[in-house]
Amino acid sequence: MTLQLAQLEPFARGGNRLCFVHPDDAGRCVKVRRPDFTLEDRRRKKGFPKNLKPLSSFDDNLEESRVMTGLEKRYGERIFRHVSRCYGFVDTDFGKGLVSELIRDGNGAISQTLKKYLWDHGLTEECQAAVQALGDFWQSQAVPSRDLLLHNIVVQRNNDGTIERLVVIDGLGSSGLIPAGWLPHSLQQRKSARKVANLHERIDILLGQRGQDTFPGFHGLLLHDDHPDHHNEKGGPVSP
C-alpha cells in the first residue's frame, strides 16, 4: 500500500527532507526527500572528491536507517531514552519514506525543538537540568553523532508543561572517517564530550540572539504542531 502524502501539509521541512505525520499512526512520522532537491543536486553541490561518491551515499533516509539499526544493536532499549525510534521504510507518493517515532507532548502536540524552546523561554532551570541529563547520557554512553544541533533536538513536555526529556531526532552516526565503534571507549567518550561542549556553546550563542525581532533561520520551526485542538473540520492541521 502506498501512503498518500502529497495532499497533506508537512509539519517540518529540512534542507533535504519533508516530514509528515503518518496518516495511519499519529505516533509516527514519515520522512521523504524534498521533490525540489534531488540526490543529483546534492552531489553536484559537493566538491571533489565527495562528488565522486555514488548517489545512494547522499540519501539521508538510507543513512539514518543504517545508523539507527546500528545504534539499536549496540545499545539496546536504553538508547531510546534520548533518541527517537526508527521503524523502517514505506512506499509513498514521494517515493520511499522512512518511518520514525514522532515525539509528542502530553497534550498531543508535536514537541518543539530545543532551538524554539530556548528562543521562547530562555534557559530555564528545568531546561538546564534536561540539557545536563542529555549531555551526561551522551558522554557516558559514548553515543556517536555529528554535531548536536539545536534544531535536531526536541523538548518533550508533560501535560502541565514541565519538561519530560530531550530527544535527538537527527544528526546521529559517526562524524569521522573511522566508525566510532572501532575506537577505544575512552576516545569515543572524549569525542562525545566535545559534541556536548559544542552543544552548550550553541545554546549560549542562541541565548545571545534572543533580543532580535525574528527567529534565526527556518530550521527548528514547525510548520504546524498537529495539536488536536488545531485541526479544521475536515481533520487536517491548521497552519499557524
PLM region spans:
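Conserved structural core of kinase catalytic domains
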Residues: 72-130
